[in-house]
């Protein structure tokens, strides 16, 4: 079984779960986290139980988890009484941090104390990490309040990184830079945007929400969780070579 921890409105997550239906993939939403029946122990005390799609799931049967929420906010908990939402959001966030950290199966991305998807960074934080990783940076000017969307050029291109693999039609030098950035940020799954696809492009930004429903990336993610899928992917790559 594979769990995708995501908001119920996350369309790429829903598409991924549908693609992986044959592998018993389930969407784990915040509504599931409000249901009775969860069991989590600090240390090896008893059997862990999760709930997804309203069903009790032994933690031992979980082959992997993809996390698509950085933290739980009161706005995520409209099914909770208004006056309790801030408290419940903090409690669920703390519970998820403990639960995800203790799972022995692959968890992408692994949580940190700053975020359930790995360390979140503002635009300036990603620029600093990119500089340390040797990426080429643009001159930037910040205005306040910030615009709702970055003003990127139309030729800008976004690639996805999973471990040491880059998915996207860019120059190999940019693919290598994207992988270096993910390693420097200590995350396994990352979306990286460059000013264009050719060598010499500048780094524009990064975020932890790549479109996981893209076929090539979805296949690589599945190979991380299901050994048979990993062997099949390796055979395809070997045949193509």
Predicted regions and their residues:
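A short local loop/turn or secondary-structure capping micro-motif enriched for an aromatic residue
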Residues: 117, 147-148, 172, 209-214
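Extreme N-terminal starter segment of soluble prokaryotic enzymes
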Residues: 1-3
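A generic structural motif
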Residues: 21-27
